[in-house]
Structure formats: structure tokens, C-alpha cells
């Protein structure tokens, strides 16, 4: 019985270590080690992009988009396994941190940049 309990406890410990833990006070600039989590589930947040000269490159991948209203200031926070994105103006998304869900209210505004679009900039 003790062996089964310890085995289950070990499995739970492995799952917890791969999740974000602890409290995160409201911030527009989460730490580098948290960017993968926050930018995976809402990629339109401004802290997920490096924007220069009208183009934005996603910090976690090779996606390049035209700079527009798609890139939006976000405030993120975490408290008791609740993760929250706040886009201002009453637009927010709350999810269980260990069961995240993609959310992107600005998806329609995303305009990927391609080489043949370069004359449009």
C-alpha cells in the first residue's frame, strides 16, 4: 500500500514540476522562463513579440507579422492555480493554470508577413 502511495505521489510531483508554480503578481513583463507558457496560450500579448520597423517577430518561434492592433498590451497574473490574462477594457481570460486553454480575441487581426509583402510596408 505504501509503495502504491509513493508511486502516485511521484507521478504527481513530476506533473507539478512541469507547471508554473507560485504566485505571480500582475505584470506586463513576465520573466523569460515564463514566456513559453504565457505566449503559447495567448500569442497576441505585446510581451511575446519583438517589434521594429513595422514588423513583429514572435519570441518563441519564427513567425513574423505586420505590426498592427493584433499585438496588444496584456497584464498576466497567477494565484492559486488560476492564470489570468487582462487585455484591459473589461476583456480578460481566466483559466486553470494546470489545464490551460488557447484564447485569442484578436486572431482576425493577425497578418503574417511574407517576403512578397515587403513592398506593402
Swiss-Prot record:
InterPro entries: ASFV_fam_110. Transmembrane segments: none annotated. Induction: Expressed in the early phase of the viral replicative cycle. The keyword Metal-binding does not apply. Pfam families: v110 (PF01639). The keyword Nucleotide-binding does not apply. Keywords: Early protein, Glycoprotein, Signal. Residues 1-20 form the signal peptide. Glycans are attached at residues 62, 116. Belongs to the asfivirus MGF 110 family. This is Protein MGF 110-5L. It comes from African swine fever virus (isolate Portugal/Lis 57/1957) (ASFV).
Amino acid at each position: 500500500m505504501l509503495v502504491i502511495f509513493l508511486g502516485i505521489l511521484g507521478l504527481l510531483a513530476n506533473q507539478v514540476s512541469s507547471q508554473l508554480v507560485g504566485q505571480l503578481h500582475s505584470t506586463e513583463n513576465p520573466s523569460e522562463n515564463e514566456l513559453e507558457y504565457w505566449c503559447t496560450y495567448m500569442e497576441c500579448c505585446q510581451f511575446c513579440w519583438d517589434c521594429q520597423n513595422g514588423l513583429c517577430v514572435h519570441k518563441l518561434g519564427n513567425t513574423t507579422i505586420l505590426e498592427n492592433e493584433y499585438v496588444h498590451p496584456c497584464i498576466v497574473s497567477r494565484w492559486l492555480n488560476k492564470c489570468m490574462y487582462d487585455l484591459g477594457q473589461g476583456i480578460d481570460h481566466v483559466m486553470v493554470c494546470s489545464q490551460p486553454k488557447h484564447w485569442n480575441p484578436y486572431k482576425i487581426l493577425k497578418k503574417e508577413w511574407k517576403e512578397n509583402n515587403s513592398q506593402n510596408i
